[in-house]
Structures are given as structure tokens and as C-alpha cells.
């Protein structure tokens, strides 16, 4: 879901060239949902193997990761851990929305309105624990580092960006800004739109507010921990309240658990237990997982596996040379 203030903050269109030579932390769950929604057949249904299991996420992880490496961008995938208890309401809302979409999809199929069915099919994107674990397994076969966050993946990715271990957080949501990520890149794992760069300092300077104020605006509008926000208050009114200095008083009165929500953003659970090193891929392991177990096309996978091997071999070789001549 994420906070919805994208229309009110400065964004800059960038190219893949602008990210050349940089490491980025990918909000894993956000990207996997994108893949489930966008990587589909013409009738709107997701890719499946012969057992009927959805494989769209594996397709996205494999080919998008290689595409980034081809552009000299090193992806570090970050996955969610245990969500804060306050997120349960948001998860319930999401489940209900998917259930409604599934009913409408089935109704459209009965009427043989396949265009309408495809529209609703994209909203029925269930990401199972098995899919997530398989994506992690695929990344390990590919030699790509991933991080298991103790709680929210975006919080962990933001922490890594603040430390300077990665240059930016990659996510379609804006929540990473609330965790203090210095830079957020959108549209990097999509295909239709140009990447956008959002810089936290530019946002705060443009609005003439602090990060604390930005978090308050988000809480007014609604976050994953208080979906819907404060009734009748959108960005403009929230901004006015923040600028007038009365925002906190209003929020404490209107938002249950305000202090706890604020603490989630300002003091998130994070870990330093991660590696950023690429490893040579397990070629046979990748082919076994994608082709033998999930019915991907052998020729296409083999071509990309060879490409992946060469990309990582060259990167690790260059890193060794750089270290030698330091």
C-alpha cells in the first residue's frame, strides 16, 4: 500500500546510465508483487508450471536481476521479516480487496468477458511464503546477495542506504523516505516507465519541513500502520497543520497508537548481519530450478545463465584488480 504523497514531492527522471557502478537495495516484497501483477499471459493469468504453481515471481527475479547487472547496477535484495503488529489491519484490508477482485474476475469469466477478467486477475496477486523462499533460493543459486530484515524490508534497505552500503533504495512506494533513506529509485524493476529518483534532502528543502514533519504528514494521510489516516485530511491540509506547528497535538488526539507508529519509522528493527558480495552462479542449479522444476524455456535460460556467469566473473575480477592496485 504505502503512503500516497507522490504527487506532492519533487522527482527527477533518470536513466540506467545514472546508476552505473552503484549498488542498490531492492525492496524485495514490493518487487515480487510487481512481478506477480505485471508478468502475465494475454488473458491476464500469471505464468505457471505444469503443477499449476505460479512462477511469475521467479521470472522477474531472474531476468530483471540480470538486466540490472548488464547495466552495471548491483542489486542487493531485501526481504521482510516479522511485520509490526500494527500492520495487521492493513494486511486484512489487502486480503479483502483481493477476495473481492477474485469474485469479480470469476463473474467476468462466466460472462466470457475476458478483457474484464484480465483486469481483475491483476489485482489477485497472492504471494505465498513458498514463492518468497523459492525466490531467495534462486538468488542464492545466482550468486546474488539478499538480506533478511528482522522486520520491515524497506526499513532495512533504508538503513543500508543511510550507512552508505548501497546508493539508494529501489521501491515503488515512498515509505523508505520516512525511514530516512537518502534516495529512493522508482520504476527500476518495471519495464514501461523511466526510472525516477527522489532525494530526501530535496524533498525536505522543497517543502521546508523536517523528516519528523514528513512522517506526521504521512500519518495524517494514512500509512501501513493506520490505513485511511485521519478522515478528511489530505496532503495539503496535513502540510498546513505541520507548518502551523499544531500537527502533533491533532495527531495525538485523532490517531490511536500515534507514538508507536512514529517509533516504527524512527527506530525500526534492523540488522548489520548481511553481505554485499557477489558470487559465481551455480549454472546447473539454476537450470534445474527454472527449467526442470518450473518449466522455463531451456534455450532462453541457458543463454541468460551464461550471461550472468560472465557478468559476475568480470565484476569479481575487476574488484580483485582494484584491491590489488590500491
Curated annotation (Swiss-Prot):
Pfam families: XPG_I (PF00867), XPG_N (PF00752). Residues 317-325 are annotated as: Interaction with PCNA. Residues 1-98 are annotated as: N-domain. The keyword Hydrolase applies. Its EC number is 3.1.-.-. InterPro entries: 5-3_exonuclease_C_sf, Flap_endonuc, Flap_endonuc_arc, HhH2, PIN-like_dom_sf, XPG-I_dom, XPG/Rad2, XPG_DNA_repair_N. SMART domains: HhH2, XPGI, XPGN. Residues 116-245 are annotated as: I-domain. Mg(2+) 1 binds at residues 27, 80, 152, 154. Binds 2 magnesium ions per subunit. They probably participate in the reaction catalyzed by the enzyme. May bind an additional third magnesium ion after substrate binding. Its cofactor is Mg(2+). Optimum pH is 6-7. SUPFAM superfamilies: 5' to 3' exonuclease, C-terminal subdomain, PIN domain-like. HAMAP family: Fen. Belongs to the XPG/RAD2 endonuclease family. FEN1 subfamily. PANTHER family: FLAP ENDONUCLEASE 1 (PTHR11081:SF9), FLAP ENDONUCLEASE FAMILY MEMBER (PTHR11081). Interacts with PCNA. PCNA stimulates the nuclease activity without altering cleavage specificity. Structure-specific nuclease with 5'-flap endonuclease and 5'-3' exonuclease activities involved in DNA replication and repair. During DNA replication, cleaves the 5'-overhanging flap structure that is generated by displacement synthesis when DNA polymerase encounters the 5'-end of a downstream Okazaki fragment. Binds the unpaired 3'-DNA end and kinks the DNA to facilitate 5' cleavage specificity. Cleaves one nucleotide into the double-stranded DNA from the junction in flap DNA, leaving a nick for ligation. Also involved in the base excision repair (BER) pathway. This is Flap endonuclease 1. It comes from Methanocaldococcus jannaschii (strain ATCC 43067 / DSM 2661 / JAL-1 / JCM 10045 / NBRC 100440) (Methanococcus jannaschii).
Amino acid at each position: 500500500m504505502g503512503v500516497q504523497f507522490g504527487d506532492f514531492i519533487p522527482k527527477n527522471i533518470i536513466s540506467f546510465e545514472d546508476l552505473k557502478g552503484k549498488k542498490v537495495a531492492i525492496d524485495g516484497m514490493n518487487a515480487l508483487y510487481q512481478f506477480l501483477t505485471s508478468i502475465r499471459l494475454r488473458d491476464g493469468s500469471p505464468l505457471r508450471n505444469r503443477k499449476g504453481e505460479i512462477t511469475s515471481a521467479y521470472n522477474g527475479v531472474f531476468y530483471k536481476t540480470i538486466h540490472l547487472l548488464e547495466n552495471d547496477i548491483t542489486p542487493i535484495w531485501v526481504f521482510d521479516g516479522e511485520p509490526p503488529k500494527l500492520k495487521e489491519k492493513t494486511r486484512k484490508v489487502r486480503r479483502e480487496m483481493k477476495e473481492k477482485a477474485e469474485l469479480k474476475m470469476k463473474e467476468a469469466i462466466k460472462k466470457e468477458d475476458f478483457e474484464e477478467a484480465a483486469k481483475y486477475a491483476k489485482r489477485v496477486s497472492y504471494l505465498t511464503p513458498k514463492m518468497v523462499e523459492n525466490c531467495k533460493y534462486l538468488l542464492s543459486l545466482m550468486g546474488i546477495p539478499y538480506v533478511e530484515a528482522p522486520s520491515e524490508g524497506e526499513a532495512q534497505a533504508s538503513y543500508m542506504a543511510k550507512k552508505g552500503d548501497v546508493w539508494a533504495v529501489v521501491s515503488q512506494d515512498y515509505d523508505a523516505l520516512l525511514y530516512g533513506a537518502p534516495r529512493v529509485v522508482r520504476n527500476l524493476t518495471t519495464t514501461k516507465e523511466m526510472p525516477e529518483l527522489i532525494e530526501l534532502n530535496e524533498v525536505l528543502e522543497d517543502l521546508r519541513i523536517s523528516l519528523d514533519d514528513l512522517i506526521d504528514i504521512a500519518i495524517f494521510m494514512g500509512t501501513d500502520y493506520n490505513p485511511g489516516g485521519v478522515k478528511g485530511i489530505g496532503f495539503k491540509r496535513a502540510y498546513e497543520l505541520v507548518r502551523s506547528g499544531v500537527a502533533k497535538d491533532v495527531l495525538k488526539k485523532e490517531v490511536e497508537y500515534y507514538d508507536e507508529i512514529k517509533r516504527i519509522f524512527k527506530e525500526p528493527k534492523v540488522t548489520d548481519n548481511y553481505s554485499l558480495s557477489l558470487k559465481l552462479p551455480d549454472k546447473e542449479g539454476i537450470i534445474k530450478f527454472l527449467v526442470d522444476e518450473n518449466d522455463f524455456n531451456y534455450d532462453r535460460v541457458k543463454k541468460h545463465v551464461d550471461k550472468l556467469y560472465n557478468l559476475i566473473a568480470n565484476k569479481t575480477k575487476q574488484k580483485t584488480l582494484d584491491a590489488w592496485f590500491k
